[in-house]
Each structure stands twice: as structure tokens, then as C-alpha cells.
Regions:
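Generic N-terminal simple sequence motifs
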Residues: 3-6, 33-36, 441
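Coiled-coil-like amphipathic alpha-helices with heptad-repeat character
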Residues: 6-7, 41, 446, 459
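Glycan-processing catalytic domains of CAZymes
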Residues: 39-414
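Extracellular and organelle-lumenal recognition/adhesion modules and their flexible linkers in secreted
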Residues: 410-558
């Protein structure tokens, strides 16, 4: 049986995320001569997970520059932003309607690059300049028109590269007549060309677009609200084109294939899976990540599938309004018996776990920062949907969020340790069942149980002379594989912050393992154990810190 290593003591951790109390464990341990090698300092092997903001309050480069300090206070790693240049007459020119036959000049957008270079980014590391497939009135066989479209894409990549931003954000959705860019049925010239002819031409145009893009920015990231995920219903067919011919985005897979034909290894593409707006379960995010990674390869030419697997990321969109809209709205996320803000936290967490790197947060009716858009309410999202900002902060980085909340509570004098004998300073303590437990000479500290494998001859004891901040520690000497244990009642959905301070001696190693039992004291949810290592520093006393969410069916945290 795996070692039931202890989570350590608890403090009440009140936050806007949920009504249940969350818990904070904290303890001091001294481990000596455990038979496990100490590990050298290493690089951070975690996959980066990032939240990108977008919506009706989207900033242009000027507002981004003017409001960056305020914007970076929000729980995001970057934004999709608009580029608005000025033509020779001084009139504004939007970069976003890129699929038009209008000729633009680079110098019209030099102000956007100047804005971005003058913006003092500290937190927003991943920012993307937005373009879209509108007005979409350039026929795929219009060579002159597509020269303009290709040049618009080139300008977007140029702006991104010259400003030091991450790349281009592409919205394929048609918002203006003729709503035609990727729909074969909407093509004005479909009477002259078959679907297969349009499909081949769309791939050629994709090649031209991406060749221009990577000439400007070889290491670009092209982040789409959706890619082949929008056509998942066409998979599972011998020839997906039989389905795509009727799809509103039936030509999009060919356009993407063209991208892949010419993309260098350093280019990255992100399928944002806008379909996720309705998702309300971990299963949906995992299933659609598999769809994007596996099934959607059927929409990619065989010669491009290895490149697709290597360079196309799975991402998800989270629609904030769905957690704010009334139940009568078709865009409504149910709380499933709890608060809708709690569902926002859970769903955003699931989205980040299933995504390769990015999740985009989209809002319409409320705002995160100043906007001139009259269709957006004056209220911020934290005002309109209390707890929403904390929900996103927790999902993005539970440890950072927990540390901040604990610091707030400590400053307010309301941080209470719920662990029993957490500082190892007492020889008497009330147990989990309410029965007093007295320390026994030569034994572990009062209130703590111990375990070690049968062939280990180590000693667990109470050391009254050492401690991280005061005298008192639990000591394990020559324990080959064992742990201190404490059990507490827990409820599904609770959030537990776990902290220990450890001193290692000799060739010892230690970690905290959080395990789960049913209310009947049976082990459960083994796959959701949480293991927290000791931080790699040169300090004498080193910290273990992490967060564990109580899974369904759990009644006790161990």
C-alpha cells in the first residue's frame, strides 16, 4: 500500500469562491537520515498555463498603453488587442477586417508598434494582435483580392514581431455580409467551381498567407478562437468533405492545411475551441481536448499530421456572461447545486488542466478595464459577478492565490490553525474524535500518528529543542519509508492549503502527500492524491506548500 504521508495542520481559509470553509495545514518537521537521496536544484518542468483576456472591452494599442498598470492587476497573462492605424488622410484604419481587398500601407500602423513598445509590460507576457475573416467578400479565386488579404496578414505578423508580442489572434467567424469566407454554399462563384476546386484553392491561399506571416515572424503563435474543433462533426467519415460541403466552415480545414504546408518548426497554432462556452464538467474539457488532438487529425492532410501533432495546441474559451446571465438565457451555466462562481472556478481549472497552454476568458456585458464601447455596462466583472476574479485567480495559480489569501487573513488577525498540535508544542491535544490524546515518552508528538514500512527500523519522536520559529518539532530518524499522519473531516469541494516547514539532515528527503478516505475511513480517489515536495533552497528550514481540492465521495483528508 502506498505510504499515507501526512498533509499537515489546518487553518480556516475563508474566500469568495465558496460558502464552505477551506482549510490550511501548517507544521514543523525535522527529518534525519532517511534513506533517499537529496535532489539537486533543477529547472521548472511544469507546463505553463495561462489565461488570456478578450471581449467587448478589448483594448486597442493606445488604451493598452494608457491602462497597463490597471489591466495587469487582473488575473491574466495577456490579452487579445486591436490595432488601429491611420491612413494618409488621418482617418482610422482597423486591422481586424483583414479579409478585404483594400490596399493598406505599413506606415499606417507604425503608431501601434510605437504604443506597444512604450507599454511597460510586467505581468502580461502573452499578447496577440487581432485580425478576422471579415468582411470575407474576396472570392477564393480572386488573385488580386487575395494579394491584399495576404498583405494584411503580413502586416499583422509584422506588428507582432516588431512590438515583441506573442503573435496574431485570428477570429474566423463571419460577422458581416456576405458571411461567406469559409462557407462553400455562400460563395458567389460556386456555380463556376466545385467544392473540391474551392477546397484546393483555400489550401493554396492558406499557404500564401502563412508564408507571408512566417517570413515576418518565424516563431509566431497564431491563436484562433477555433480551428478544426468547429468541424468535429465531419470526423469519422471516409471523406470528411462530404460533410464539409454543407458546413459554414467547410473550407477552413483546407486553409489550415495550407498553414501547415509552409509553417516552420518554430510556429505554433492554437485551437481555441469556442464550443467550450457551454461546458460544465471536467469530462467535456478532457473529451474535447482528445477530439482536437486525435479526431481532428482526420481533417488534416496525412502529410501534415505529424506537424499538426507537434505544433497545434488545444485551448478553450470560457464565456463569463454564461455565469452571469439569467436561467432563461440560452447562454447559462448552472451551478449544479452550488454557486455559479464556484462552477466558474471549477470549469476554468478543468479547462487549464486539459489545455496545452492557454485558456481565453471572454466577456461581453461587463468589463475588466475602461472601454469606450457603449454596449458594455459600467460595472466591472468583480462587481457584477462577485467572486469571479478570485475564481480565475485560483484557477490560474492556486498556490499564488492561497498565499495571498493567507497573508490577508494573517494581517486581519483571523488566520486560525485548525490542526491539532500544529506547532508540536503540547503534550496533550484533543484528537479528531474529540478524545484527548496524551504524549507518550519516546513517541511521536501528541495528536500525530505514524507509519513506516515493516522493514524500516526508524524512530519517530517529539523534539522539544528545535523548531522553525519556536521550539518544538516532529522528528523522524533513520526511517526508510514512513510518515507522520493526521486525519481531518473534509467535504467535497473544499479547498485545503497545505504547509509544512522541514529541516533535512544527511541524505534525507521528505514530501507531503495528501490522501483521501470516504466517511467510512476507506481509501478512495487514489488517482487524485496530491504530493508536495520540499522547496529547493539552501535554507536550514525549507517550506512545503500547496493546495488540494477535495474530490467527490471524500469524507476525510489524510
Amino acid at each position: 500500500m502506498p505510504t499515507p504521508c501526512t498533509p499537515l495542520p489546518l487553518r480556516r481559509f475563508l474566500c469568495a469562491l465558496q460558502t464552505q470553509a477551506s482549510l490550511f495545514w501548517c507544521a514543523w518537521l525535522c527529518v534525519a537520515a532517511v534513506a533517499a537521496p537529496a535532489l539537486p536544484n533543477s529547472v521548472d518542468m511544469r507546463l505553463p498555463k495561462k489565461l488570456i483576456a478578450t471581449g467587448w472591452d478589448k483594448a486597442d494599442t493606445q488604451r493598452l498603453r494608457e491602462n497597463i498598470k490597471l489591466m495587469e492587476q487582473r488575473p491574466f497573462d495577456g490579452v487579445f488587442f486591436s490595432a488601429v492605424g491611420k491612413n494618409d488622410a488621418g482617418a482610422p484604419v482597423q486591422l481586424r477586417p483583414a479579409h478585404s481587398n483594400q490596399a493598406w500601407k505599413r506606415e499606417w500602423f507604425q503608431n501601434c508598434i510605437a504604443d506597444l513598445k512604450a507599454t511597460k509590460f510586467t505581468r502580461f507576457t502573452d499578447n496577440f494582435v487581432s485580425i478576422g475573416a471579415n468582411p470575407g467578400d474576396v472570392d477564393w479565386f480572386d488573385d488580386d483580392g487575395w494579394k491584399a488579404v495576404v498583405d494584411h496578414w503580413r502586416m499583422a505578423a509584422w506588428i507582432a514581431k516588431q512590438s515583441g508580442t506573442q503573435g496574431v489572434h485570428f477570429d474566423p467567424e463571419p460577422y458581416t455580409k456576405p458571411y461567406a469566407q469559409f462557407s462553400y454554399q455562400a460563395q458567389a462563384e460556386k456555380g463556376k467551381h466545385t467544392f473540391n476546386e474551392y477546397y484546393a484553392k483555400a489550401r493554396e491561399r492558406g499557404q500564401q498567407v502563412m508564408q507571408a506571416v512566417v517570413e515576418e515572424y518565424p516563431g509566431i503563435t497564431v491563436y484562433c478562437y477555433f480551428m478544426n474543433s468547429v468541424n468535429i462533426s465531419a470526423t469519422g467519415q471516409k471523406d470528411p468533405r462530404q460533410i464539409l460541403v454543407q458546413s459554414g466552415y467547410g473550407l477552413f480545414p483546407a486553409f489550415i492545411d495550407g498553414w501547415l504546408d509552409v509553417a516552420p518548426p518554430g510556429a505554433t497554432f492554437v485551437d481555441g475551441c469556442e464550443t467550450a462556452y457551454h461546458f460544465n464538467s471536467e469530462r467535456e474539457y478532457i473529451l474535447h481536448a482528445l477530439h482536437m488532438k486525435i479526431a481532428c487529425q482526420e481533417l488534416v492532410a496525412p502529410e501534415n499530421r505529424a506537424k499538426y501533432r507537434a505544433q497545434v495546441q488545444a485551448s478553450f474559451g470560457v464565456y463569463l456572461d454564461a455565469y452571469w446571465n439569467p436561467p432563461t438565457s440560452p447562454w447559462h451555466i448552472d451551478g449544479l447545486g452550488g454557486s455559479r462562481v464556484e462552477r466558474l472556478r471549477i470549469n476554468t481549472t478543468s479547462a487549464l488542466q486539459a489545455a496545452d497552454e492557454y485558456v481565453w476568458i471572454y466577456g461581453e456585458k461587463n468589463r475588466w478595464w475602461p472601454t469606450p464601447n457603449g454596449g458594455v455596462n459600467k460595472e466591472t466583472w468583480p462587481e457584477a459577478l462577485p467572486g469571479s476574479e478570485d475564481a480565475l485567480r485560483f484557477a490560474r495559480d492556486p498556490v499564488e492565490f492561497a498565499r495571498a489569501k493567507i497573508a490577508e487573513m494573517k494581517k486581519a488577525g483571523i488566520l486560525i490553525n485548525l490542526a491539532r498540535n500544529a506547532d508540536f508544542g503540547s503534550d496533550k491535544v484533543e484528537g479528531n474524535t474529540g478524545v484527548q490524546q496524551d504524549w507518550k515518552e519516546g513517541g511521536a508528538p501528541a495528536g500525530w500518528n505514524v507509519w513506516q514500512v515493516s522493514d524500516s527500523q526508524g524512530v519517530f519522536s517529539w523534539d522539544r529543542e528545535v523548531g522553525a520559529s519556536a521550539k518544538g518539532a516532529a522528528r523522524a530518524s533513520k526511517v526508510v519509508n514512513g510518515c507522520f499522519i493526521q486525519v481531518a473531516d473534509a467535504k467535497p469541494g473544499e479547498l485545503h492549503a497545505v504547509r509544512a516547514v522541514v529541516r533535512l539532515q544527511g541524505e534525507s528527503a521528505a514530501w507531503v502527500r495528501v490522501r483521501w478516505q470516504t466517511p467510512e475511513n476507506k481509501w478512495t480517489q487514489v488517482g487524485q492524491d496530491v504530493i508536495l515536495p520540499v522547496e529547493q533552497t539552501d535554507d536550514e528550514w525549507r517550506e512545503v506548500f500547496g493546495v488540494a481540492a477535495v474530490p467527490e465521495g471524500v469524507g476525510k483528508i489524510v
